[in-house]
């Protein structure tokens, strides 16, 4: 059992007889009395997203899952294909389950497959990935003084803000949890 206050986006729980992936968590605390945890849960059996509210201190059951090291191979527009690094077995995961992770997947990226009853139900990304900048504005003299950043599009289609010294063709390290620029690779 896990306390609802410890729920985080991406976790898997068993709730009302179904397994759900936590899509969003909002914690509201009142001046007096207990807090309220509002969640959005995606059912793995139906694919539907539902709202669930919990009182602070409530507990939910963690889903019994296993994890396998795998490598991303390719996608065909509907499914993303991964190869188990121990058995070399290939698994297809629907794009709806890959969700936002698709912006961090390039060929040969190593991930953890999330398995339930020997079937893949999702993926856990590495903390950082290296991606190439394919589109950004050119630098102008004096840009570095203003601070901040400029928009950039990466090879996977991800749009982020990067420092002014980053140019098209540069490889950068991106945090997969926040989607933010970390450093040049």
From Swiss-Prot:
<dbReference type="Pfam" id="PF01132">
    <property type="entry name" value="EFP"/>
</dbReference>
<comment type="pathway">
    <text>Protein biosynthesis; polypeptide chain elongation.</text>
</comment>
<dbReference type="InterPro" id="IPR015365">
    <property type="entry name" value="Elong-fact-P_C"/>
</dbReference>
<protein>
    <recommendedName>
        <fullName>Elongation factor P</fullName>
    </recommendedName>
</protein>
<keyword id="KW-0251">Elongation factor</keyword>
<comment type="similarity">
    <text>Belongs to the elongation factor P family.</text>
</comment>
<dbReference type="GO" id="GO:0003746">
    <property type="term" value="F:translation elongation factor activity"/>
</dbReference>
<dbReference type="InterPro" id="IPR008991">
    <property type="entry name" value="Translation_prot_SH3-like_sf"/>
</dbReference>
<dbReference type="InterPro" id="IPR020599">
    <property type="entry name" value="Transl_elong_fac_P/YeiP"/>
</dbReference>
<comment type="function">
    <text>Involved in peptide bond synthesis. Stimulates efficient translation and peptide-bond synthesis on native or reconstituted 70S ribosomes in vitro. Probably functions indirectly by altering the affinity of the ribosome for aminoacyl-tRNA, thus increasing their reactivity as acceptors for peptidyl transferase.</text>
</comment>
<dbReference type="InterPro" id="IPR014722">
    <property type="entry name" value="Rib_uL2_dom2"/>
</dbReference>
<dbReference type="InterPro" id="IPR013852">
    <property type="entry name" value="Transl_elong_P/YeiP_CS"/>
</dbReference>
<dbReference type="GO" id="GO:0005737">
    <property type="term" value="C:cytoplasm"/>
</dbReference>
<dbReference type="InterPro" id="IPR011768">
    <property type="entry name" value="Transl_elongation_fac_P"/>
</dbReference>
<dbReference type="InterPro" id="IPR012340">
    <property type="entry name" value="NA-bd_OB-fold"/>
</dbReference>
<keyword id="KW-0648">Protein biosynthesis</keyword>
<dbReference type="InterPro" id="IPR013185">
    <property type="entry name" value="Transl_elong_KOW-like"/>
</dbReference>
<dbReference type="GO" id="GO:0043043">
    <property type="term" value="P:peptide biosynthetic process"/>
</dbReference>
<dbReference type="InterPro" id="IPR001059">
    <property type="entry name" value="Transl_elong_P/YeiP_cen"/>
</dbReference>
<keyword id="KW-0963">Cytoplasm</keyword>
<dbReference type="Pfam" id="PF08207">
    <property type="entry name" value="EFP_N"/>
</dbReference>
<dbReference type="Pfam" id="PF09285">
    <property type="entry name" value="Elong-fact-P_C"/>
</dbReference>
């Amino acid at each position: 059992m896990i306390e609802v206050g410890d729920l985080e986006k991406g976790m898997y729980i068993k709730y009302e007889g179904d397994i759900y992936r936590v899509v969003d968590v909002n914690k509201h605390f009142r001046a007096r009395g207990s807090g309220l945890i509002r969640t959005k849960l995606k059912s793995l059996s139906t694919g539907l997203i539902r709202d669930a509210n919990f009182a602070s201190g409530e507990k939910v059951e963690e889903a019994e899952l296993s994890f396998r090291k795998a490598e991303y191979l390719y996608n065909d527009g509907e499914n993303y294909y991964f190869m188990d690094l121990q058995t070399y077995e290939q698994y297809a995961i629907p794009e709806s389950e890959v969700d936002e992770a698709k912006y961090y997947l390039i060929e040969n990226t190593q991930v953890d497959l999330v398995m339930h009853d020997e079937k893949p139900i999702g993926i856990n990304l590495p903390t950082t990935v290296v991606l190439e900048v394919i589109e950004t504005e050119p630098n102008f003299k004096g840009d570095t003084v203003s601070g901040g950043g400029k928009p950039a599009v990466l090879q996977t289609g991800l749009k982020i803000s990067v420092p002014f010294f980053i140019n098209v063709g540069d490889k950068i390290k991106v945090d997969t949890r926040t989607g933010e620029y970390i450093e040049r690779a």
